[in-house]
Amino acid sequence: MGATTSTTGTSRGGRGARERILRAAKELFYTRGIHATGVAALIEAAHVSPRTFYVHFPTKNALVEEYLRRFESQTPIAAEAELGRDDLPPAQRLLAIFAPVEGEPTALFRGCPFHNAVIEGAGELPEIARLAERHKQAFRDRLVATAAEAGAADPAALGRQLAVIFEGANALAASCNDAQVFTDARRAAKTLLDVALGSAPGG
């Protein structure tokens, strides 16, 4: 995602104001962080007045909640899109979630917006924590379902273990700004899948 904060339109109110605020939140919260992004920056990026901002979002936390809901419904995480592919068999879809992150080599890897929001909330934003928990559980459920499609003897265990590898890789890649972590994660996942599915090593 780029670091630009410009939005379309210059009207400070009107029917498009809510969308401009949400677009600004998606850009700034993800690239700068929730705490580092003040309301003033959001107002400036969205080209709205303070009054208009608070009409749509009485608190910053209300905007954070809607930002995550919008992210979930309109911007699928790349790994989730891989699980939905119909051109790969189930086992390959499970490996595809560990594909290296594409983008500029110098770009910061920001990781999962839900994970980031929970960490920044530090237990003080319970509704945001619930949104993130629901999202992560849904992702684990998809991994379990795909593991069952692949023929795993214990799909629940395999799905949970793959989730641990994936979430750990996301966190480490974001902490170290090193997307190559996913290469190691993919190798670990491949070993796990070979054992769980009874595949021959090196296949």
Where are these regions (language model features)?
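Hydrophobic alpha-helical connector segments
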Residues: 66, 80-109, 155, 159-162
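Hydrophobic alpha-helical segments that form the core
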Residues: 154-175, 184, 188-192
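Amphipathic alpha-helical packing segments from all-alpha helical-bundle domains
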Residues: 76, 82, 92-96, 124-149, ...
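Amphipathic alpha-helical segments used for helix-helix packing
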Residues: 93, 106-130
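Short coil/turn segments at alpha/beta junctions that flank glycine-rich nucleotide-binding fingerprints
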Residues: 31-35, 108, 150
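Short, basic, alpha-helical segments at the C-terminal edge of helix-turn-helix-like DNA-binding modules
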Residues: 69-75
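N-terminal intrinsically disordered/low-complexity leader segments
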Residues: 1-16, 197-203
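Helix-turn-helix
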Residues: 2, 20, 24-62, 66
